[in-house]
Amino acid sequence: MRERIAKLTSNILNPFLVSLVLILLLSFRSTSSTLDAVKWLLVSIAISILPVLLAIIYLVRKQRLESPFINVRKQRTKIYLVAGVCAGIGCIIFPYLGAPPTLRAAFVAGLSAVVVFMCVNLLWKISLHTAFVTASVTVLIILYGSIAAVTVVLVPLIAWSRIELKHHSPAQVIAGALLAALIAVVVFYLFGLL
C-alpha cells in the first residue's frame, strides 16, 4: 500500500506536470488578458517542456534510457543538455518577445538549476522530483504570498515518495530541495520579484 501511494505521488508530482502547472499559473499571474496568458503558456511549453519530453520519449524507445523518469544517474546527462539548451533559448528570446518578468525569471532559474544539477550529477544523483516541487512551491509563495503556503506540504510528500521507492536517499532529496529553493529565491530576487 505504501509503495502504491509513493508511486502515485511520484507520478502525479512528476517534473513535467509540475512544470506545466507552474507555467500555467505564471502565465496567468503575469499577464492582463487571457489571450496573452494562453500565448505565453503555449510559447513556454513549446520551448521548455515539449522538447525535453520528446527527447525522453525518443531515447526510451531507442532503449538509451531506462524509463521516462531517469533513475540511472549516468543516463541523465543527455536530458540535462537538452533541458539546458531549451532553457537557454528561452532566456535569450524571451526578452526580445517581451515576455513577462516572471516567466523570464522562471527560465533563468530553470537554466541555473540545470547547470548546477548537471554538475552535481557528474558525481552524485540528486532528486529532480523533489527539486521541481520545491522550486515551484518557492515561486508560488514568492508570487502569491501566504495563500500559497499550503503547497509546502507537497515537498515532504514528494521527498517521502522518492525515498520510499528507493530512487533517492534522504540526502539526495534534501539536497534537491535546498538547491532548488535557493536558486529560485536568488533569481527572483535578482529580477526584483521577491
Spell out what each predicted region is.
Residues 1-7:
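Short, Lys/Arg-rich, polar N-terminal cytosolic tail immediately upstream
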Residues 18, 81-92, 131-134, 180:
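Core segments of transmembrane alpha-helices
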